[in-house]
Design a protein with these regions (language model features):
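Outer-membrane beta-barrel "beta-signal"
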Residues: 69, 176, 498-512
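Gram-negative (and chloroplast) outer-membrane scaffold detector with strong preference
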Residues: 63-72, 76-79
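Surface-exposed loop and membrane-interface regions of Gram-negative outer-membrane beta-barrel proteins
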Residues: 31-68, 95, 302-303, 309
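C-terminal closing repeat unit and adjoining cap/tail of repeat-based domains
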Residues: 466-488
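Beta-strand-dominated lipid-handling architectures at cellular/organellar boundaries
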Residues: 1-5, 286-288, 482
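Signature for the C-terminal beta-barrel architecture of outer-membrane proteins
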Residues: 13, 44-45, 77-79, 94-96, ...
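Short, solvent-exposed loop/edge-beta patches enriched in aromatic
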Residues: 22-31, 73-77, 434, 471-473
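Short glycine/proline- and aromatic-enriched beta-strand/turn motifs that initiate or cap beta-hairpins
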Residues: 1-21
Length: 512
């Protein structure tokens, strides 16, 4: 059994943690549990991950205790892993490249699925982001068997990805469908709106004056009579015999709008893709594959100027090459977005952070999805390259770069202008321990900016590092830090201090 104790940051608050992580091996299965308790300096227990108040909450609590369940290895005919997914790719990555459901851990603890199957009928690969969301995001790729080459001339695969409701990325503690940020009663699923801020929900049985103007606006005969009686007593008159004695005093209550209900107003997005690949060199220490791929996104986005709905677009890779030379790997693609409204590798490491966010502008809070921002991209074309290399037996490094030229929306010009759309990703991993440093990892991602080397952060920026240091036999100090960004005021930048989101975990793990 392993365990850990330390501190974590959840929703901006520091909590102490005690965790027990027993592992149960069975045949080719490995089952690891994650029994974690959080408490603050006052002894208050963080109960969101120990909530049995309803059937749905109980289900999620039980699922939450699964650290992982794995079967086999990725090279086996059958492999799957249930739990935290560090990295998921589909095919050559036109839709899914580097997706992770663990970027907000431990603040958000997702339990997903990574699956691969290989047999004479072909191969299949799939993933699910989180069973607690009742499968919010699902992706599948089918690669046809080799005997289909007579039909397609080379190996072919089809992919589909669906996010059935982008709003599921918003936190909703009580499960009433209203995200916590717009729910006036985030821990009570019976109530969600309090227009006058008096502590009584608009739908509370004792709330007769919802807008707080002193005049009853809910038809309750006792409350109405009480109002007229009190008014009559104040002015020295008896209204009990008047015709209006049974009438509502307030005929036009001014109430706050109903908050978003993600259960009744889902916003899905999906995509289809096809890819062809043909190996031209296959040797022990070298292989080269040429490929092509195309994808069509399904859904609508918004024109950044008019707000009109636009259909999502298509991305094409008419030519790509992937190669491995000993310790190095290299890939290159020529990319095209014929009509705009498309993003390559849409489901990437930062997707759960960009999926749906709240923006407050001019006193109004609204939900902004990643899909709604695709309207900023017009027709584009350019290249993408990736290099990975093992440096001896100690380090593994990787870097990716995209440079697209075409039409992008400019807020100052209020029009699409010719500009560059670039992305840069880099990572460095320690693959062999050095003295007491048992593991280390650094990563940086900057997507869809004019120049990623200006290091002007956006919502597409995510960076962090992890390290584990052995301080005694069987005892290790683990440190995790991640920084991402949110445009909370909708001004197009993330310069405000509260728009920087830091996630820090410090724990001491031990083996029994």
């Amino acid at each position: 059994m392993t365990g850990a104790f330390g501190t974590v940051t959840i929703d901006g608050k520091v909590w102490n943690q005690i965790a027990l992580r027993p592992v149960t091996p069975f045949w080719k299965f490995n089952i690891a549990w994650d029994l974690v308790f959080y408490f603050d300096q006052d002894g208050n227990v963080y109960d969101e991950n120990w909530n049995f108040s309803s059937g749905e909450k109980a289900k999620n609590t039980i699922i939450d205790k699964i650290y992982y369940i794995s079967y086999g290895r990725k090279s086996d005919p059958l492999y799957f892993k249930i739990g935290a997914l560090d990295r998921v790719d589909l095919g050559y990555g036109i839709l899914v490249n580097g997706y992770s459901n663990a970027v907000q851990y431990p603040s958000v603890r997702n339990v997903g699925l990574d699956l691969s199957v290989k047999n004479k009928l072909g191969s299949a690969q799939g993933f699910v982001n989180d069973f607690k969301q009742n499968i919010g995001i699902v992706g599948v790729r089918f690669r046809l068997p080799n005997n289909f080459r007579n039909l397609f001339f080379m190996p072919v695969a089809f992919s589909v990805v669906l996010d059935r409701n982008q709003y599921l990325g918003l936190k909703d503690f009580d499960g009433d469908g209203r995200p916590d940020l717009v729910d006036h009663f985030p821990r009570n699923d019976d109530y969600w709106l309090d227009s006058d801020g008096d502590g009584l929900a608009d739908n509370h049985a004792a709330e007769f004056d919802r807008d707080g103007d002193g005049f009853p606006d809910v038809y309750d005969i006792d409350a109405i009579h009480s109002f007229w009686d009190n008014l009559g007593e104040a002015v020295g008159q008896d209204f009990s015999n008047e015709t209006f004695y049974d009438s509502l005093p307030d005929q036009e209550a001014i109430l706050l709008p109903e908050p978003l209900n993600v259960k009744k107003s889902p916003d899905p997005i999906g995509a289809l893709a096809i890819d062809f690949g043909y190996p031209i060199v296959v040797q022990d220490n070298m292989n080269i594959t040429v490929y092509a791929q195309a994808a069509q996104m399904m859904g609508t986005t918004l024109h950044p100027g008019t707000g009109d709905e636009l259909n999502l677009g298509m991305g094409l890779v008419p030519f790509g090459v992937a190669s491995h030379f000993g310790p190095a790997s290299f890939s290159f693609e020529y990319r095209m977005i014929p009509k705009g409204q498309f993003e390559f590798s849409y489901w990437n490491r930062a997707y759960d952070l960009e999926r749906a966010t709240f923006v407050t502008s001019f006193g109004e809070t609204k939900v902004v999805t990643k899909e709604s921002k695709l309207g900023r991209y017009g027709e584009q074309k350019g290249f993408y390259a990736h290099l990975g290399i093992n440096i001896g037996s100690i380090l593994k490094a990787g870097a990716s770069y995209q440079n697209l030229l075409g039409k992008n929306w400019d807020d100052i010009e209020a029009d699409y202008v010719e500009s560059e759309n670039k992305s840069f990703l880099a990572s460095l991993n320690l693959t062999k321990s050095i003295s007491r440093l048992k593991y280390a990892r650094l990563y940086y991602q900057q997507r869809n900016v004019p120049n990623p080397f200006d290091f002007e952060y956006t919502e597409g920026t995510i960076m962090g590092y992890q390290a584990g240091i052995e301080i005694a036999s069987g005892i290790m100090l683990n440190y995790t830090f991640q920084r991402s960004f949110r445009d909370l005021d909708g001004d197009g930048d993330v310069d405000s201090p509260d728009e920087t989101i830091n996630l820090t975990t410090i724990e001491t793990s031990f083996s029994l």
